A protein has these predicted regions:
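N-terminal lobe/hinge region of extracytoplasmic solute-binding protein
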Residues: 47-98, 213-215
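Surface-exposed binding/hinge segments that line
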Residues: 95, 131, 135-201
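Alpha-helical secondary-structure segments
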Residues: 118-128, 173-179, 219, 248-250, ...
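Gly/Pro-rich hinge or "lid" segments in bacterial periplasmic/extracellular proteins
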Residues: 180-246, 250
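Ligand-site clamp/hinge motif
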Residues: 205-208, 214, 239-284, 299
Length: 543
């Protein structure tokens, strides 16, 4: 989703217990403080957003529209500061002696906005719900490291043989343990992601109703009803106990289907914060907004994904076709002219903001080389028909999509066209259902700051965001090898070996690393965007 560096993800095996005691046992700080009395607290911040794809359940939200709302309404065991560093929130401590069994202690005094206490069972029940295959949760994959996942989420169409993971044990109201199938030192650092948020017991009584009106424990609470395709309003949560206390009265997230319109409203000061600038104004937004323009690196990548479940993209020669297409894309020119320097050509499948990023893993296959691209396509037997690229028109993608297929067409001499969908949800629905017929744009905003988060959720077999339906057992083995590693260097070596397989198979073509672009109105101050590319709404105040 979230998405989108991810975090200071690694704790080596030899220092795991000590580091966790120092980093995760202490109550962390942030730019906001729990005891602060917010100034200008009566003001509502007006934000541009997107319609969430699904009902608002943490374990079923894996896209930016819903992810933003989740981050406002819920708080996990940890959060991440503006640089991706882990900060304790609901967690009083997270400790381990072997990087396989972790003891989680929950702080006292936390409540959901309906008055229910946030306790150990709030997390354990939510994670078990998210993992159970019959619940069909998109984020189920994130619980795979936990012992017992295979029983609640078997491969294929098999029915689960258990309803809860035996690796999750509630000790008492404030303590639970998590036992992983294998040692994984980095596990705690992913616990700030949406999938790991707690749920109140009331959620399970009527999940459909809860998805429309979620009850969380975060900095904000829902204010009224979710008005679909119009707005979602949240107000400050008066019982919030964490460090991210809102310095404003709330956020009114207005749903836009056109970035040109949201930008026009920003210039008119009719909206306060915009995340994402339309490609149509990338050449002018810095001049228009001056110091209020945002253009900064973030853990977000843009790519072109192929539906490998369609016969034409699931042949031995189709790998070479995809490699040829990749070499036919003039990334340097597109990022410089169309994207106006707000993106950098990709050289791997991750992001420059994470440890393990590589400048050369993709090598020649991510470099513009018309001669080699033509030769490779010819060796693959050519391409028949029209190469279509699907995209959503509400995200400001038209110009770069057209520039991309024009580059491919001019280089390879094949017919290309764009297939426009009116909004993100319309594009994502057939992708999620596995019924998309053509290649399509994808963007990944990191969930937590680590190399494996650019790989496992997108390319592991059965992963919730494996839009290509990529399936390579050797790749999955390398992911597991990296997860079991006891040092950052060992893990990165395995993950990068997996990336090399991706270069060979090319289920997804890396395009560029996207900067966070955005802006804010003349009416607000203290506006910053985090390493995930998301505004830090709790700090924003009205002038």
């Amino acid at each position: 989703m979230r998405g989108t560096t991810r975090r200071a993800r690694w704790v080596s095996a030899t220092t795991t217990a000590a580091c966790l005691a120092l980093v995760l046992c202490a109550c962390g700080g942030n730019t906001s403080t729990g005891s602060a009395s917010p100034k200008a607290g009566g003001a509502i911040i007006l934000a541009a957003g997107m319609e969430p794809q699904n009902p608002l359940l943490p374990t079923n939200t894996n896209e930016a529209g819903g992810g933003l709302i989740m981050s406002l309404l819920f708080q996990g065991l940890i959060s991440y500061d503006s640089h991706g560093k882990s900060i304790n929130q609901v967690a009083a401590s997270i400790t381990t002696t072997d990087s396989q069994t972790f003891t989680m202690k929950v702080k006292a005094g936390w409540t959901f906005t309906n008055g229910e206490p946030v306790n150990a069972r709030s997390f354990v029940d939510a994670w078990n719900f998210g993992a159970l295959s019959t619940n069909n949760q998109l984020n189920a994959y994130f619980f795979e490291p936990i012992e017992g996942y295979a029983e609640v989420h078997p491969v294929g169409d098999a029915q689960p043989t258990a309803r809860t993971m035996n690796g999750l044990v509630v000790i008492n109201s404030s303590t639970f343990t998590v036992r992983l199938a294998t040692a994984q030192a980095s596990f705690p650092s992913r616990l700030g992601y949406t999938a790991f948020y707690p749920l109140p017991q009331s959620a399970y009584k009527n999940l459909k109703a809860f998805g429309e009106h979620p009850i969380g424990n975060g900095s904000y609470m829902l204010d009224g009803n979710w008005v679909h395709n119009v707005s979602i309003k949240v107000k400050r949560n008066p019982t919030y106990k964490g460090t991210l206390v809102a310095k404003n009265a709330g956020v009114d997230v207005k749903v836009y289907t056109d970035q040109i319109q949201s930008y026009a409203d920003l210039l008119a000061n009719d909206v306060d914060v915009v995340q994402g600038i339309s490609d149509g104004v990338l050449d002018s937004f810095k001049a228009d907004l001056g110091s209020r323009a945002i253009n900064q690196p973030s853990g977000t990548t843009d790519s072109l994904t192929f539906p490998l479940y369609q016969p034409e993209w699931n042949t031995a020669s189709s790998k070479q076709v995809r490699q040829a297409i990749s070499m036919a894309i003039d990334r340097q020119t597109i990022t410089k002219t169309v994207l106006q320097g707000t993106s950098t050509p990709a050289t791997d499948f991750s992001s420059p903001v994470v440890q393990g990023y590589s400048k050369d893993i993709c090598g020649e296959f991510c470099a513009f080389n018309p001669a080699k691209a033509k030769a490779l396509l010819a060796a693959a037997g050519g391409f028949k028909g029209t190469l279509e690229i699907a995209y959503n028109t509400d995200g400001g993608h038209k110009a770069w999509v057209e520039a991309t297929w024009n580059s491919i067409k001019a280089t390879l001499g094949i017919d290309c066209s764009a297939r426009a969908y009116p909004d993100r949800k319309s594009l994502r629905d057939p992708i999620t259902k596995g019924s998309m017929k053509v290649a399509f744009r994808t963007s990944w905003q990191m969930d937590y700051p680590a190399l494996e988060d650019f790989l496992a959720p997108i390319f592991a077999k059965g992963a919730g965001s494996n839009d290509a339906h990529y399936d390579n057992p050797s790749f999955d083995d390398l992911l597991q090898e990296g997860d079991k590693a006891t040092t950052p260097a060992e893990a990165i070596k395995s993950y990068q070996a997996g990336e090399k397989l991706l270069v060979t198979d090319m289920p997804v073509i890396p395009l560029w690393y996207a900067n966070t672009t955005g802006g804010y109105s003349e009416n607000v101050s203290n506006v910053k965007f985090d390493v995930f590319g998301v505004p830090i709404f709790t700090d924003i105040t009205r002038k």
